[in-house]
Amino acid sequence: MAEFIHGNQSIHYELAGVREFRLRTPVLLLHGNGEDMHIFDNMIAPLLGAKGFVLMDSRMQGESFSLDGGGEISYSAMADDAAALMDELGINEYDIVGYSDGGIIALLMAMKSFKVRRFFTIGANTDPSGLTAKAVREIKTALRRANHKGDERTAALLSMMLNEPHITSHQLAGIIAEATIILGKKDTVIDRKHSERIADAIPHGTHVLIEGAGHDVPDRKSVV
């Protein structure tokens, strides 16, 4: 595993798959809230001989950490970290697969950069209103638990889910990359109509429902 320093953040990442991945439009993989890059291990295992992958732990998650104990925890900051890493690696065109929070980061990156050729979001939302009532209750319960334990990092990550993002349909309309917005048919975290509206707002957007899957699509299907 390698380390990339971006501001006051140590971002840990890994390159996997074909060696000449820069020549084959590599895939950047972005995990969900409080997770790490290894959620994608099973999904990419059959594809390592044909594709190149960049896996990373988003800031203050997994093996990534703040060098001075500070730093902003936001989707925008995480998107900036990921874009800076790809620039550091000299990758000028790439695809993204983002799961849950990683899907939000993928949307933000596609809004800002022409280097994103196409992207897949799995169980992502563009506004806290896209979370189901059940998900909000569970996040608030987890947040109270984290605050009680004095776990500031986890509390900040959970608060982010309740207060961000705020991506408008106008911003989505400016995305030029091809987008596949994926939702498990049994997902109890993201509202289906909200997910469908994301795809409808992106000019080259498609919505896909995965039969039999909940919010944990990376464990069920290969979408790359």
Question: What kind of feature is each model-predicted range?
Answer:
Residues 9-65:
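Conserved HGGG/HGGXW glycine-rich cap/lid loop of the alpha/beta-hydrolase fold
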Residues 223-224:
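Conserved small/polar residues in nucleotide/adenosyl-binding loops
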Residues 45, 55-94:
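Active-site loop/oxyanion-hole signature of alpha/beta-hydrolase fold enzymes
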Residues 33, 94, 98-100, 184:
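Conserved alpha/beta-hydrolase "nucleophile elbow" surrounding the catalytic nucleophile
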Residues 188-194:
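Conserved alpha/beta-hydrolase "acid-adjacent" motif
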Residues 156-171:
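Active-site nucleophile elbow and catalytic-triad environment of alpha/beta-hydrolase enzymes
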Residues 104-115, 119-146:
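Flexible "cap/lid" loop of the alpha/beta hydrolase fold
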Residues 175, 181-183, 187:
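Short beta-strand/loop motif that positions the catalytic acidic residue
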